[in-house]
C-alpha cells in the first residue's frame, strides 16, 4: 500500500496516516489498544521525529521520538 490509509488490527490498535511500501511512513496517528495515542512522523513502521504522545490519563507529551527512545519529552500543560 502507498498513500494515505487506515489499518485496524484485531488487537484494537489503529493506524491512520501515510504508507509507503506497506509500512507506516510519513505523518500518521497510531492509537494503542489501551487508548493511548501517538501522532507524528513514522519511518518504516517506527516512530521517528517530531511527535506527540497522549497517555491513557490524557496527558500530552511532545518532543522528538526515535523508535523506542524519546529523549527530552516535554509535558504539554493546558492552563
UniProtKB/Swiss-Prot annotation:
Keywords for this protein: Repeat
Domain of life of the organism encoding this protein: Eukaryota
Cited SUPFAM superfamilies: Histone H3 K4-specific methyltransferase SET7/9 N-terminal domain
Entry-linked Pfam families: MORN
Mapped MORN repeat ranges: 15-37, 38-60
Disulphide bridges: none
Stored PANTHER family: MORN REPEAT-CONTAINING PROTEIN 2 (PTHR46917:SF1)
Identification of the protein by name: MORN repeat-containing protein 2
Species the sequence originates in: Bos taurus (Bovine)
Gene coding for it: MORN2
Amino acid at each position: 500500500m502507498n498513500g494515505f490509509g487506515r489499518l485496524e488490527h484485531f488487537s484494537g490498535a489503529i493506524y491512520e496516516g501515510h504508507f509507503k511500501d506497506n509500512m507506516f511512513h510519513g505523518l500518521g496517528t497510531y492509537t494503542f489498544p489501551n487508548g493511548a495515542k501517538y501522532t507524528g512522523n513514522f519511518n518504516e513502521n517506527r516512530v521517528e521525529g517530531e511527535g506527540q504522545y497522549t497517555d491513557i490519563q490524557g496527558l500530552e507529551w511532545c518532543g522528538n521520538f526515535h523508535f523506542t527512545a524519546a529523549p527530552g519529552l516535554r509535558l504539554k500543560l493546558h492552563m
